[in-house]
Amino acid sequence: MTRIHINASTPYDVVIEEGALQRITDYIKPLKPNCRVIIVSDSNVAPHYLDSVKANMEHAGYAVCDYVFPAGESSKNAHQLIDLVEYMAAQSLTRKDLLIALGGGVVGDMAGFAAATYLRGIDYVQVPTSLLAAVDSSVGGKTAVNLEAGKNLWGAFKQPILVLCDPATLNTLPEMEWINGCGEIIKYGFLDVPGLLTQLENRPLIKHRGSVSGVIARCVQAKADIVEQDERESGIRALLNLGHTFGHGIEKASHFEVHHGYAVAIGMVLMAQGAVKHGELDTEALEKLKALIKAHDLPTTTTISKEEILAAAKHDKKSEGATIKIVVPTSYGHSELKVVTHEELATYLD
């Protein structure tokens, strides 16, 4: 077992342990001994784990209800969120009760936002069942849904009281979801995580999955170190958006047919290519990045136009009027924040 403590406004632990899902009540009882519980999941994850988690919670004395919505990024919208919160109200859940987000990034984002806003906030636990959620979105307290204008534009910061990651749940993931998670993992390699790039080069995770628990722990620790310094993204936390400025544009323009980790991988390459043009990154580093991305079966190019990507960037959360904060890789394994105008941003895609 690996336990990583995050000293945020609500301090909590991230527990990474094989088989932890079967003992979920051992972790929740000390935190919430007497309350009602709502488990939020989606149509992909619920058939695998909902019944067993619900039975374990009920056996431990909890009264449990559940809410399952259609899987996919297209469900992460205001209408689905309101339906969830209306259901919570219909169940007469109180501020003393608990929400469990059982699923990948979409489940965690939407369920977390429901927890942040229902009755002005109730406790919630993240139980990530996808690689992407395990290494990134379940940690740090960002919650949101998408709007027509762009991705994650309606949200709140709300830290969970626990993140419980059972790597055994990754065994039921389709191949695409493993690849999807690798996009975010490679991102961490460019945020000064010692040895991560070398490990991924020598033993690509997509082919050496036995090392996944250690990789998850390294990514979570890296994110914890940043979140503890900048919980609400007023400074260095923006580094975690490497690949996301262009990546979110690709997702939106594709109507979310391009999955998040895939889009982040392409976004990293596009920004790195722009950095080479601007003399901020050498060509060798760019080629090594491309090779690493390809080694994890991720794409490095897109057919989506520059205009569509830049249009989405105007709605990016890091945009402030005429300027936008971007994350630029400046060496192999290191990235820096930079404020540019939207006109200057366009030159990174020329």
Question: PLM ranges: what are they?
Answer:
Residues 84, 111-115, 185, 250, ...:
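Buried hydrophobic packing segments
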Residues 15, 113-203:
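A glycine/threonine-rich phosphate-anchoring loop and its flanking beta-alpha core
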Residues 106-113, 134-135, 249:
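Short glycine/serine/threonine-rich phosphate/pyrophosphate-binding segments
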Residues 1-97:
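ATP/NTP phosphate-donor binding region
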Residues 199-307:
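Active-site segments that bind and position negatively charged phosphate/pyrophosphate groups
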Residues 85-99, 111-126:
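Non-catalytic interfacial helical region
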Residues 183-185, 280-350:
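C-terminal charged capping/lid subdomain of soluble metabolic enzymes
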